[in-house]
Amino acid sequence: KLAQEGMRFTQAYAGSPVSAPSRACLMTGQHSGHTEVRGNKEYWTDSAPVKYGDNTDFSVVGQHPYSPDHIILPEVLRNNGYTTGLFGKWAGGYEGSVSTPDKRGIDEFYGYICQFQAHLYYPNFLNEYSRKRGDKAVSRVVLEENIKYPMTGKGYEKRTQYSADLIHQKAMQWLDQQQAGKPFVGFLTYTLPHAELVQPEDSLLEGYKKIFFVDKTWGGQPGSRYNATVHTHAQFAAMISRLDQYVGDVMRKLKEKGLEENTLVIFTSDNGPHEEGGADPTFFGRDGK
């Protein structure tokens, strides 16, 4: 419906093949050859481990920070009177760096600081920040139900706090607070259907299991944090439909609040196809657009 009622950009491509530099293009307005962010460099590799239950994670996560000398899109908008929210993946700096959402023009944030962490849908923690609440910095929100069970292997399926749904709920709560006459911009940087192929065992997934009744399996990789799955095509298709439902929720909320005629909605992506986590871009015909 969004495509039918709007304008389609059929020759538009993401700014880079991978997420952090692609997002840097959007945030800085620079070509990928000019922005400082050239890849998905991970800062957790140098950080000390931290325990969440029996699970080991990293004490600092994130990517190369945007330069504080270069003003970025949320800062421009906030400086011009917009309320700003970002819900999903940041990938524009690491925890404690000069470039976290609280320091770069974002009023409300909930999601992942790190693009690598954002590959996992039942994580140990998410990050949050609220200027309205008086928060001083981005902090971690431990997902207490998830950390009762292992990140990988037997028992993982008992984790119940699905990050994509949690992030969408926060985004909708924020959107519901916005009012006509007060400009706002929301960066809803959802991660579906990227990387890990997993979601709640609900009617949406079960429906696709019936469609892809002879499905492709993926057995995982040694040392990988991605769990094996026996329904790669059904998982991927259902994750796309789940994202589609999120978009529908946003459009209905804008209409409900009388904001749809004065709100510009842009749907785009930050990276091209990949085979990570068992994804099958050949089957689904993705070409990076």
Segment roles from a protein language model:
Residues 1, 10, 40-42, 90-92, ...:
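Active-site-proximal cap/lid insertion segments
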Residues 1-72, 76-82, 96, 104-108, ...:
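Active-site segment of extracytoplasmic enzymes that catalyze sulfate/phosphate-ester chemistry
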Residues 15, 88, 112:
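Conserved residues at the C-terminal ends of beta-strands
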Residues 76, 80, 87-89, 246-248:
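Conserved beta-strand->loop/alpha-helix structural units within folded catalytic cores of enzymes
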Residues 83-85, 186:
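Conserved beta-strand elements of the Class I
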